């Protein structure tokens, strides 16, 4: 039991609004909270009878509490959100969603381009979104290309064009770069695309019908036919899209919480169109009540800077929670805009809410089933290895290269819930003889265990995907680096079976080098192969990316006079390394910054001339 003098602490505590941080014996922040009245709120933690098991566990670890006074509840809400993101305390509900949201961007250029955008919105233009994921944006871009012939190329490529590209030939771009379309006609298509993205499909069709009739009256039959085809395509799309009768913006959130797993399934509706859906799984400490889960998710999600820009008119939530009114008010004040959470809705909204709730419920049911399977596999592995303790964390290392080129080592991490991708690591291996897997493994293991401590990142088991030599090297390093630990990691080598056939793998204990096998139909065997295969996938993906980057860079930048700037111009103008290699001297001279002499040098170097 941690020692903390609550009576002395509470004696001089202010009753103002503010934020508190609770620390454990290691000096780590284990909980962050806000309060309208700090004294009243913190006193509740130290009552004689604490009903909540989670609160009992939290209080038993407190050794210190820091408080920060704020001017208002709104300031406290904002500061609490900042502290939670900064410290990621173990007893807080955590929305682990640090990726920004993708948008569809229509630039402010003379000839605007449509593009995928993620990150700060610095460039002048219009942003449509947020979309739930990158796939939804790319799908929309693909659709828009078929409906409106607007360019999607970047400005450098656009400026360098001297003839239409393939997109023009496919009818997906009107080639404003080489004046194949008038500024007025291009601007008209941009305006129609903008209306379409705002959900004003009928207005777009009406405008096109007027244009078609006008073109026909003026005997411009080819133009009239083009408008007719565009109208037909739009109507087909409209039939396929799910559209809300309400043309406003709203987020519909279905929530299901069971056995410490919470799923928030969100439907993003903007301008009456369903942009897509996305499920969120916040990290929830055991025995956390549903009110805290709901309040934490709503505040963390809607105070995300990326979401604030496109806050919907209303949020529809499948169930209410105790401080809903206070949170609504604080978020509205913080964001300086109207913010309403509705839990009682009818008609179309109720239908959307049922859909979101069904998805959330199914997601949690699936996760619980997976969790039970995963838990069973861990138990079977513990039993097979006769460990005498539970496995909390496993790591697996693999090496990938092509004939010694672009060597990459991977380290993947599994816990009892499966792959823990936030802790995955890749190591770019350098300074070794190409193809020396022993040296590569030595470098990777050294880097992983160089500063090993007891902060929860110590693996119980480390799998080495390789032969006995690599296992011996890894074991020697771990013995040295982890000598101070009470329970250093157990190392196990995973070697291919006879004929390198799957299902015939052999396992070797590090140190004793004793071999053992597991039945190929056992859960323990499947768990080891799962982490081994994931390590292999992660290593080979990193290796391929590194190899491609190296080849693209080295083959051009090894040419005298070609640096990063010219390499980028060549690749962007001609479309890739193979196109650069196949280009004539005349074609190379059309690239900005490439003189005739430089073009000849590049041509000769790549052709071996």
From Swiss-Prot:
Annotated TM spans: none
Lineage start: Bacteria, Pseudomonadati, Pseudomonadota, Gammaproteobacteria, Alteromonadales
InterPro entries: GIY-YIG_endonuc, GIY-YIG_endonuc_sf, GIY-YIG_UvrC_Cho, Hlx-hairpin-Hlx_DNA-bd_motif, RuvA_2-like, UVR_dom, UVR_dom_sf, UvrABC_protein_C
Gene Ontology BP term (one): SOS response
Similarity comment: family membership: Belongs to the UvrC family.
CDD domains from the UniProt entry: GIY-YIG_UvrC_Cho (cd10434)
Encoding gene, per UniProt annotation: uvrC
All copies of domain GIY-YIG, residue ranges: 15-93
Keyword flag Acetylation: no
Pfam families listed in its UniProt record: GIY-YIG, HHH_5, UVR, UvrC_RNaseH, UvrC_RNaseH_dom
Domain UVR, first and last residues per copy: 202-237
Keyword vocabulary terms for this entry: Cytoplasm, DNA damage, DNA excision, DNA repair, Excision nuclease, SOS response
Subcellular location(s) of the protein: Cytoplasm
Quaternary context: Interacts with UvrB in an incision complex.
GO terms of molecular function: DNA binding; excinuclease ABC activity
Function text: The UvrABC repair system catalyzes the recognition and processing of DNA lesions. UvrC both incises the 5' and 3' sides of the lesion. The N-terminal half is responsible for the 3' incision and the C-terminal half is responsible for the 5' incision.
GO cellular component, one term: excinuclease repair complex
Protein name: UvrABC system protein C
């Amino acid at each position: 039991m941690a020692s903390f003098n609550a009576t002395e602490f509470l004696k001089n505590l202010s009753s103002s609004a503010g934020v508190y941080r609770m620390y454990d014996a290691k000096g780590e922040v284990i909980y962050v909270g806000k309060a309208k009245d700090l004294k009243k709120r913190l006193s509740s933690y130290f009552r004689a009878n604490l009903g909540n098991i989670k609160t009992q566990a939290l209080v038993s670890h407190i050794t210190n509490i820091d408080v920060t006074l704020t001017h208002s509840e709104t300031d406290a809400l904002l500061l609490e959100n900042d502290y939670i993101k900064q410290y990621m305390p173990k007893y807080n509900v955590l929305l682990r969603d640090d990726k920004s949201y993708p948008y569809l961007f229509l630039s402010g250029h003379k000839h605007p381009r449509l593009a995928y955008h993620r990150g700060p919105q610095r460039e002048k233009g219009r942003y449509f979104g947020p979309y739930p994921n990158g796939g939804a944006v790319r799908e929309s871009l693909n659709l828009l290309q078929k409906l409106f012939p607007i360019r999607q190329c970047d400005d450098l490529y656009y400026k360098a064009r001297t003839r239409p590209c393939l997109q023009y030939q496919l009818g997906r771009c009107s080639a404003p770069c080489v004046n194949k379309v008038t500024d007025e006609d291009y601007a008209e298509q941009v305006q129609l695309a903008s209306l379409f993205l705002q959900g004003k499909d009928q207005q777009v069709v009406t405008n096109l019908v007027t244009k078609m009739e006008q073109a026909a009256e003026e005997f411009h039959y080819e133009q009239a036919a083009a408008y007719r085809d565009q109208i037909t395509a739009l109507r087909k799309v409209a039939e396929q899209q799910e559209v809300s009768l309400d043309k406003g913006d709203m987020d519909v959130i279905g929530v299901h919480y069971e056995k410490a797993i919470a799923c928030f399934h969100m439907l993003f509706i903007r301008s009456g169109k369903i942009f897509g859906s996305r499920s969120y799984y916040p990290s929830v400490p055991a025995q956390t009540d549903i009110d805290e889960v709901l309040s934490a998710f709503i505040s963390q999600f809607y105070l995300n800077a990326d979401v604030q820009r496109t806050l919907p008119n209303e949020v529809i939530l499948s169930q209410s929670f105790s401080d809903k009114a206070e949170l609504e008010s604080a978020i509205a004040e913080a964001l300086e805009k109207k913010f309403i959470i509705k839990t009682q809705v009818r008609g179309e909204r109720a239908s959307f809410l049922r859909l979101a709730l069904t998805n959330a419920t199914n997601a949690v049911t699936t996760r619980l089933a997976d969790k039970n399977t995963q838990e069973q596999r861990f138990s079977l592995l513990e039993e097979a290895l006769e460990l005498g303790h539970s496995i909390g964390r496993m790591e697996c290392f693999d090496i990938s290269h092509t004939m010694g080129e672009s060597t990459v080592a991977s380290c993947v991490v599994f816990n009892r819930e499966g792959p823990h991708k936030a802790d995955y690591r890749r190591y770019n291996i350098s300074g070794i003889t190409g193809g020396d897997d022993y040296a590569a493994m030595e470098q990777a293991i050294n880097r992983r265990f160089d500063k090993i401590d007891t902060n929860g990142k110590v693996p119980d088991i480390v799998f080495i995907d390789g032969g006995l030599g690599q296992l011996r090297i890894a074991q020697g390093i771990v013995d040295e680096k982890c000598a101070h630990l009470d329970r250093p990691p157990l190392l196990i080598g995973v070697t291919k079976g006879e004929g390198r056939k799957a299902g015939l793998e052999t396992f070797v204990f590090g140190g004793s080098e004793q071999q053992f096998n597991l039945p190929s139909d056992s859960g323990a065997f499947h768990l080891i192969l799962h982490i081994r295969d994931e390590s292999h996938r992660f290593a080979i993906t990193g290796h391929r990316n590194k190899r491609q980057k190296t080849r693209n860079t080295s083959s051009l930048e090894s040419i005298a006079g070609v640096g990063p700037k010219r390499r980028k111009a060549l690749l962007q103008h001609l479309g890739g390394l193979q196109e650069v290699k196949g280009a004539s001297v005349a074609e190379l001279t059309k690239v900005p910054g490439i003189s005739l002499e430089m073009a000849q040098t590049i041509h000769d170097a790549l052709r071996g001339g």
